[in-house]
């Protein structure tokens, strides 16, 4: 083993196998209340009615989270039957995409394959990621697409490959289709931080960025169409503007006492054991 390496190749393989067992075994745990079971029932309704353009929460039209999480869960139920295992499969696959993208991103940033493996292990071992694979909501799907998009953006800035520009736009579109504009904000801040560090502004702001914009615009057409079919122009306004504004202004949320240490104590458990 190289003295600069924290883990041997054997240890890395064994740890990845161990985490794979943890995540796969989590497929068979009964769904938690409230959101996981609720989202599963909403996806099940799509499957049974063969209707992927309308989302209902009980008997009421659901104008909140975008369609991607429900689409993936419903398609999985179509393929594997209606069960909590089928509901969790897309989340598990998206987290696998997130772990792989984390590895590849770390390799680009540090020019070191070993660091990439360590980064993927840190990602897989974080308590919040393990929880998102078991208590499945939109988080697992969103996380996988966001990390994939950031990896492709950084790869595009480094290499100027057209394929990375297309994948960066599509990855951002998938993240948007999972959570709305907040996903774009997260990706944007990450890329801005990288550009401030690398100073590669000209490699980002050039004509090829139009390819990113076009692939993003094409990628969000399905979710915009679904919102328009169910809610008309109100649905388009909601996903493009109102949803994010409501979250930033806390409109529609119950008023509670502010917890100024919320992110501090949340991060303490979310990234255990690191």
Report each predicted region and the residues it spans.
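Membrane-interface alpha helices of multi-pass inner-membrane proteins
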Residues: 131, 164-179
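Transmembrane-helix signature of polytopic, membrane-embedded enzymes
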Residues: 9-17, 102-125
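Transmembrane signal-anchor helices characteristic of membrane glycosylation enzymes that use polyprenol
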Residues: 7-36, 214-227
